[in-house]
Structures are given as structure tokens and as C-alpha cells.
Curated annotation (Swiss-Prot):
Sorted UniProt keywords: Cell outer membrane, Lipoprotein, Membrane, Palmitate, Signal, Virulence
Organism of origin: Salmonella typhimurium (strain LT2 / SGSC1412 / ATCC 700720)
Lipid anchor positions (N-palmitoyl cysteine): C16
Record membrane topology: Lipid-anchor
Gene of this entry: invH
Protein name per its UniProtKB record: SPI-1 type 3 secretion system pilotin
Family statement drawn from the similarity comment of this UniProt entry: Belongs to the InvH family.
Taxon lineage: Bacteria, Pseudomonadati, Pseudomonadota, Gammaproteobacteria, Enterobacterales
Main function: Involved in the synthesis of the type III secretion system (T3SS), also called injectisome, which is used to inject bacterial effector proteins into eukaryotic host cells. Pilot protein that is required for the proper localization of the secretin InvG/SctC in the outer membrane. Required for the secretion of the Sip virulence factors.
The organism's place on the tree of life at top rank: Bacteria
């Protein structure tokens, strides 16, 4: 399936998200489910490894799969790398969802800057550690609406 890249304006997520083209523009190639999943995982891993701020253990260990390795340290590194990539993917998807639901922040640099200012304030509040990126962005959005 052809995809285009949409850059997210979130200071935490420097990178681009793959967004499927509308069905009228592209026709997906039929693949068995397992092949689609493997391809998606490979793309996610490649994208994760290419980040400029990848944790040092991920940068050293380019293999994110947990193959039968003799060294337990390499297994732990592969597992922590997989966790990092999964968290990155979830965070990126949540931010993309928020900006799809609230496109006004994509259209106006001023609105985006106000959102990021409120976003930082929400992050600094006690009890905000357990909030997801989506919940934090939504809280910042609601504060802006209340002003």
C-alpha cells in the first residue's frame, strides 16, 4: 500500500508518521495477514532505529528481534529496544490521533505554539506522569478552550 508522510508538530515527536492514502488514490495489494504484519513490524523497527534520539542500547543493537542468542545481555537489549519502539509507536499514534481530531493546530503556527505552552504546563503538574500523550494534549486543548 502506498503511504505518504505527515510530519507531526509535537516537540517530543521529531519525525514523520505514515498515513495511508485515501482508498480512491491507491489500491492496496492483497497480501496474506502474516505478511502484512511482518511488513508493518519491519517498517516500524526501521523507523524506530532511524530516530536521531534512539537510546544507546538500541543504536548498538540493530537487531530488535529476540533470536536465540548466546549472550543474555543481547537478549535484554533486544527486549528493551522492542519496548522502546513499541512505546514510540503508541506515542506517535496518539499524537497523530489528537491532531486529526483537532486540525486547527496543524493550520496555525500560533495555535500550535499556544497548545505546546499549555502542554508543557500540564506535564509539569503533579499527577500528570500517568497521562498518555493524547490525554496530555487533550488537557492542554481544554485549557485553551476555557480561556
Amino acid at each position: 500500500m502506498k503511504k505518504f508522510y505527515s510530519c507531526l508538530p509535537v516537540f517530543l515527536l521529531i519525525g514523520c508518521a505514515q498515513v495511508p492514502l485515501p482508498s480512491s488514490v491507491s489500491k492496496p495489494v492483497q497480501q496474506p495477514g502474516a505478511q502484512k504484519e511482518q511488513l508493518a513490524n519491519a517498517n516500524s523497527i526501521d523507523e524506530c532505529q532511524s530516530l536521531p534520539y534512539v537510546p544507546s542500547d538500541l543504536a548498538k543493537n540493530k537487531s530488535l528481534s529476540n533470536h536465540n542468542a548466546d549472550n543474555s545481555a543481547s537478549k535484554n537489549s533486544a527486549i528493551s529496544s522492542s519496548i522502546f519502539c513499541e512505546k514510540y509507536k503508541q506515542t506517535k499514534e496518539q499524537a497523530l490521533t489528537f491532531f486529526q481530531e483537532h486540525p486547527q493546530y496543524m493550520r496555525s503556527k500560533e495555535d500550535e505554539e499556544q497548545l505546546m505552552t499549555e502542554f508543557k504546563k500540564v506535564l509539569l503538574e503533579p499527577g500528570s506522569k500517568n497521562l498518555s500523550i493524547y490525554q496530555t494534549l487533550l488537557a492542554a486543548h481544554e485549557r485553551l478552550q476555557a480561556l
